[in-house]
């Protein structure tokens, strides 16, 4: 059995207006290497971008890894570490008997986590955490760049902040 590569991933999402133009930012660190990823969407929500950031990061990995994934989104972290288990058992219905919002991204994030060992960490946003601040900048710049790409899963009647 081989030892898994260990890396750190930092993620953030941004939305102007919520809903409005949005973007995500990712900083991935492996040993002395750093990779940044970001993109923007014409109409989306902050929570969708907070979910998309770790999805993009995890989907970029070609082999199973041991990951410390850090975000300032309690929604994303609690969703993937706590709420998702009940949602899956109840066929993606919440404890209040409503359909899970952003279910397309929750399913995608769940699938993206399966081959990795992930420790999910939370940091307070806008509190001087260097990598989180960089992700915030990447996400905001992507959102401000007048993106034309559609967030195909965004449904105004179903999704919310």
UniProtKB/Swiss-Prot annotation:
Residues 3-144 form the RNase H type-1 domain. Its EC number is 3.1.26.4. GO terms for molecular function: magnesium ion binding; nucleic acid binding; RNA-DNA hybrid ribonuclease activity. Mg(2+) 2 binds at residues 12, 136. It catalyses: Endonucleolytic cleavage to 5'-phosphomonoester. Binds 1 Mg(2+) ion per subunit. May bind a second metal ion at a regulatory site, or after substrate binding. It comes from the Bacteria. Keywords: Cytoplasm, Endonuclease, Hydrolase, Magnesium, Metal-binding, Nuclease. One of its GO terms (biological process) is DNA replication, removal of RNA primer. One of its GO terms (cellular component) is cytoplasm. Belongs to the RNase H family. Monomer. This is Ribonuclease H. The gene is rnhA.
């Amino acid at each position: 059995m081989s030892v898994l590569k260990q890396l750190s991933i930092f993620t953030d999402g941004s939305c102007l207006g919520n809903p409005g133009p949005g973007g995500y930012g990712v900083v991935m660190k492996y040993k002395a290497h750093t990779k940044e990823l970001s993109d923007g969407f014409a109409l989306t929500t902050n929570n969708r971008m907070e979910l998309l950031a770790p999805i993009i990061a995890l989907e970029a990995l070609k082999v199973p890894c041991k990951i410390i994934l850090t975000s300032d989104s309690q929604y994303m972290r609690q969703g993937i570490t706590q709420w998702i288990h009940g949602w899956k058992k109840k066929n993606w219905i919440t404890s209040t008997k409503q359909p899970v919002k952003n279910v397309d991204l929750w399913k995608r994030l769940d699938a993206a986590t399966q081959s990795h060992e992930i420790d999910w960490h939370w940091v307070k946003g806008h509190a001087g955490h260097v990598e989180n601040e960089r992700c915030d900048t990447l996400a905001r710049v992507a959102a401000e760049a007048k993106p034309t790409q559609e967030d195909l899963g965004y449904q105004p009647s179903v999704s919310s902040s």
